[in-house]
């Protein structure tokens, strides 16, 4: 089994001192930095977008892990790929068909980026099994997407276990 990766999110960072916050994560041993991108449509909240990723891309050596919680991720995949994302994770629930998801994953790979697929807490994990061979990351949401500082949903643990068994 691969070692666990901790990817601290900048969602609750002090944006007036974002460079220092990211450096602190880096100095603390983080290898990834997680960007929760929210559009106010797919989820209720709006977070940040391309300017934030572009502005900090050159100040650290961490892997830029971009989680697109947006209604039309395909439209923005090229923009985030060019802005410095190393991993782009899209949501299963944003798409009308499996074919659209496979095309989005291929688009991410066309930019030489790692592709991830996220599922909301109520989405059956079996829904994404067919995509696993094409993915480098799977994100099983253990909170409702769109808000920080929520209580962990214990119901997500059996999904994670089932996913691990499917991958192994």
What does each of the following model-derived ranges do?
Residues 118-122:
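Short gly/ser/thr-rich secondary-structure transition/capping motifs
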Residues 1-89, 95-103, 107-110, 114-115, ...:
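Conserved N-terminal beta1-alpha1 strand-loop-helix module at the mouth
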Residues 143-145:
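Short glycine-rich anion-binding loops that position phosphate/pyrophosphate groups of nucleotides
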Residues 168:
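Conserved phosphotransfer cores of two-component systems
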């Amino acid at each position: 089994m691969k070692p666990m990766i901790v990817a601290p999110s900048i969602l609750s960072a002090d944006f007036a001192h974002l460079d220092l916050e990211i450096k602190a994560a880096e100095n603390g041993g983080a290898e990834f930095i997680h960007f929760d991108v929210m559009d106010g449509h797919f989820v209720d909240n709006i977070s940040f977008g391309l300017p934030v990723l572009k502005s900090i891309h050159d100040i650290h050596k961490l892997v830029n892990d971009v989680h697109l919680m947006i209604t039309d991720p395909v439209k923005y995949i090229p923009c985030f790929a060019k802005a410095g994302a190393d991993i782009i994770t899209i949501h299963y629930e944003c798409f009308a068909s499996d074919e659209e998801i496979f095309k989005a994953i291929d688009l991410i790979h066309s930019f030489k980026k790692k592709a991830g697929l996220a599922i909301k807490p109520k989405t059956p994990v079996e829904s994404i099994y067919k995509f696993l061979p094409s993915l480098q990351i799977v994100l099983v949401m253990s909170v409702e997407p769109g808000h920080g500082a929520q209580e962990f949903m214990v119901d997500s643990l059996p999904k994670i276990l089932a996913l691990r068994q499917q991958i192994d």
